[in-house]
A protein has these predicted regions:
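Thiol-based oxidoreductase modules, predominantly thioredoxin-like and allied folds used
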Residues: 33, 56-77
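Local sequence-structure signature of Cys/Sec-based thiol-disulfide redox active-site neighborhoods
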Residues: 16-57
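Hydrophobic residues at beta-strand termini and immediately following loops
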Residues: 5, 63, 105
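Non-catalytic, surface beta->alpha helical segment in thiol-disulfide oxidoreductase systems
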Residues: 85-120
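Short, glycine/charged-enriched secondary-structure capping and boundary segments
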Residues: 45-48, 76-78, 109-111
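A short acidic, often aromatic-flanked loop/helix-cap motif at beta-alpha or helix-coil junctions
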Residues: 10-12, 67-73, 111-114
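Short, P/G- and charge-enriched loop/turn segments at secondary-structure junctions
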Residues: 78-84
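N-terminal leader/targeting and pre-domain segments
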Residues: 1-29, 93, 117-120
Length: 120
């Protein structure tokens, strides 16, 4: 499953300091926080369907926060949350969860590295 994060999910992460357990439950999940213009994100986005096929039970979420038209959340506020809470100013930024627990993070990574960090 690959899908975009909602404004409510992003606001909840800002409130709680991480993404809700319901999003990351299951064997593996990845949350990608990025901006639409990033060439490395374009590369990653192109291989996500292959990752989804290989990782049948994985949950893959993303948000391109620079182009979101959120009602109650400013794009810059979400970027500041990502940079300050997760101490990462680079994009794309990826958080990996195994069995519902945060396991590690990365920035751009190859398809094989992405699959490996999700347990394959």
């Amino acid at each position: 499953m690959i899908r975009k994060l909602t404004e409510a999910e992003c606001r909840a992460a800002m409130k709680n300091g991480d993404f809700e357990a319901a999003l990351v439950q299951g064997p593996s999940a990845a949350i990608i926080l990025t901006q639409s213009w990033c060439p490395q994100w374009t590369s990653m986005k192109s291989y996500l369907p292959k990752a989804e096929e290989a990782l049948k039970d994985a949950r893959i979420y993303y948000v391109e926060y620079d182009i979101e038209n959120w009602e109650k959340l400013e794009n810059e506020a979400f970027m500041a949350f990502k940079e300050n809470t997760f101490n990462n100013r680079e994009i794309p930024y990826v958080r990996y969860y195994l069995n519902g627990v945060f396991s590690r993070d990365s920035n751009y990574i190859s398809l094989e590295g992405f699959k490996s960090r999700l347990g394959l």
